[in-house]
């Protein structure tokens, strides 16, 4: 059996019990090199196989091959393995060659939201600004549709060296529909030693320095700051 495991933010306390048990039981851990390096501090006795960014197919195929040989293999992903993770690709590649079990993890949308307060208490859209797999024009269309619907947006992969201006452009799209004073927030390096969180306006967010390890939240027209926390009301009547 091949287990595809989402291990959360990387902090041991952020792993689900099921994810921790699956990794503990495995002989071989396969994953992106940054994630493998995180797990080595918790599971130093395991065998590891890692690849770089843009080598996802190779690492998934390796995990499938080793599971087919009878090894206890886990393919690890940060956050949840079914949300921008490797679960879908493994199903496409495996074609019933091995039994697959997907083990959910805490995705950045959830863990980052908890740090900021409660920004996702109503309908929201999760959108990645990475155009490696999705054309930028289609991503912008989705951002526009979410803003038109007055949904909170949780933005994954907001920036990189090659895509330095993408978040600013996304904010400009939203600002044509929503107020520039819309409450927003971001969390960098969730659950890690250099974690940083900030609540700010849409106008300020457009000029913000973010990276691939940042999760961004753009509020809706009802999102507000309560006691220093970003909160999107669900709609309950509060006396």
Label the predicted regions.
Residues 2-4, 72, 148-239:
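A contiguous loop/helix-start segment that scaffolds small-molecule binding in enzyme catalytic cores
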Residues 7-14, 134-136, 198-200:
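Short gly/ser/thr-rich secondary-structure transition/capping motifs
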Residues 7-9, 31-34, 51-53, 78-80, ...:
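Fold-independent oxyanion-binding glycine-rich loops
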Residues 42, 86-87, 113-114, 137-138, ...:
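Short, well-ordered secondary-structure micro-motifs
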Residues 85-149:
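Class I SAM-dependent methyltransferase SAM-binding "motif I" and its flanking Rossmann-like core
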């Amino acid at each position: 059996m091949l287990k595809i495991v989402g291990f959360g933010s990387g902090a041991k306390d952020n792993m689900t019990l099921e994810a921790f048990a699956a990794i503990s039981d495995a002989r071989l851990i396969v994953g992106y090199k940054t994630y493998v390096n995180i797990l080595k501090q918790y599971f130093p006795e395991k065998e590891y196989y890692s690849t770089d960014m843009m080598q996802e197919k190779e690492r998934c195929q390796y995990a499938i091959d080793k599971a087919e040989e009878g090894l206890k293999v886990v393919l690890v992903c940060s956050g949840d393995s079914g949300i921008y993770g490797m679960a879908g690709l493994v199903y496409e590649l495996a074609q019933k060659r091995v039994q697959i079990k997907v083990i959910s993890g805490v995705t950045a949308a959830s863990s980052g939201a908890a740090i900021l307060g409660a920004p996702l208490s109503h309908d929201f859209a999760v959108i990645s600004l990475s155009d490696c797999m999705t054309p930028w024009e289609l991503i912008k269309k989705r951002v526009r549709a979410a803003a038109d619907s007055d949904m909170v947006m949780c933005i994954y992969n907001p920036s990189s060296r090659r895509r330095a201006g993408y978040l600013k452009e996304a904010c400009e799209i939203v600002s044509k529909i929503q107020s520039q004073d819309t409450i927003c927030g971001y969390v960098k390096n969730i659950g890690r030693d250099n974690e940083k969180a900030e609540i700010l306006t849409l106008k300020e967010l457009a000029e913000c320095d973010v990276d691939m390890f940042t999760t961004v939240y753009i509020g809706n027209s009802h999102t507000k700051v309560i006691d220093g926390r970003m909160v999107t009301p669900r709609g309950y009547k509060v006396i």
